[in-house]
């Protein structure tokens, strides 16, 4: 399994984070699902295609079973980009889950899938089977239209973001701010699952300096996104200096500063701080923002 796939799932696999996401997105912040009511279930299922046995794997899935009575199986699928085939993929996952229930010869329960979309553009890809597959009008009475539940994390309201009580609030706030402003103002809110948060941000933004920053904190040290970005900023400055020294020319130093500024802008640092950290003028930083946009 690719490392990025694993790191995407790490934070959401914690019961407190999983329950929090479900409570906010499905129940408008009401504490319906408790962490102790969740139990892990296998996310990988097998199916046969072209005469060969193949496997498919959900990002994260858990069984909701308060008091030992199963209410539902709930699964997450993370998306940083729109996927036109998402209704078909979700239908495949849920069909496999129901098939497993039949094989287990136990009680049957519903399957719910939440597609967590972190893109900066509204989801315009198909949200149902009918939107993806052409079904003639005369066949529609006989073909069920399977819809999917897409939650646009970057478009959550401030109220919805504040409903989160787990570390996922930090993740959601990051994407909401970056989508609205192109900048990120970090909070002083403490991070409980530091490794999980930084790995998820690294995977979703494709910037592994989030994950690298974790190694710079001492064990038991209180960590916030403010302190994380301080480490990231310092790392960016050092990388810029190193690149400039290795090139050994004025052009090399300028290139190092420019690359540092680009990296810090991608992290969401305010332009004024980027200019100061990279030894550039605010006009130069604004020009780099224009190139990125």
Question: What is the predicted function of each stretch?
Answer:
Residues 1-293:
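Elongated, amphipathic alpha-helical interaction scaffolds
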């Amino acid at each position: 399994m690719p490392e990025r796939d694993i790191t995407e799932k790490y934070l959401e696999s914690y019961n407190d984070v999983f329950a929090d996401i479900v409570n906010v997105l499905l129940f408008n912040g009401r504490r319906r699902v408790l962490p102790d009511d969740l139990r892990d279930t296998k996310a990988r299922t097998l199916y046969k295609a072209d005469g060969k046995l193949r496997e498919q794997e959900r990002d994260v899935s858990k069984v909701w079973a308060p008091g030992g009575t199963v209410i539902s199986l709930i699964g997450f699928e993370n998306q940083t980009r729109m996927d036109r085939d998402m209704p078909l993929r979700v239908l495949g996952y849920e069909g496999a889950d129901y098939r497993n229930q039949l094989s287990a010869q136990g009680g049957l329960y519903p399957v719910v899938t939440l597609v967590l979309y972190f893109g900066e553009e509204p989801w315009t890809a198909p949200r149902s089977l009918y939107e993806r597959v052409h079904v003639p009008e005369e066949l529609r009475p006989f073909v069920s239209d399977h819809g999917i539940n897409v939650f646009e994390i970057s478009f959550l309201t401030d109220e919805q973001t504040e409903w989160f009580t787990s570390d996922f609030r930090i993740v959601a706030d990051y994407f909401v701010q970056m989508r609205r402003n192109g900048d990120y103002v970090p909070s002083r809110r403490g991070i409980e699952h530091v490794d999980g948060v930084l790995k998820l941000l690294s995977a979703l933004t494709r910037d592994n300096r989030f994950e690298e920053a974790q190694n710079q904190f001492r064990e038991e040290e209180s960590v916030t996104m403010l302190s994380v970005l301080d480490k990231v900023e310092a790392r960016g400055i050092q990388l810029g200096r190193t690149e400039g020294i290795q090139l050994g020319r004025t052009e090399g130093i300028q290139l190092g500063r420019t690359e540092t500024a680009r990296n810090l802008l991608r992290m969401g640092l305010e332009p004024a701080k980027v200019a100061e950290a990279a030894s550039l003028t605010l006009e130069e930083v604004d020009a780099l923002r224009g190139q990125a946009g």
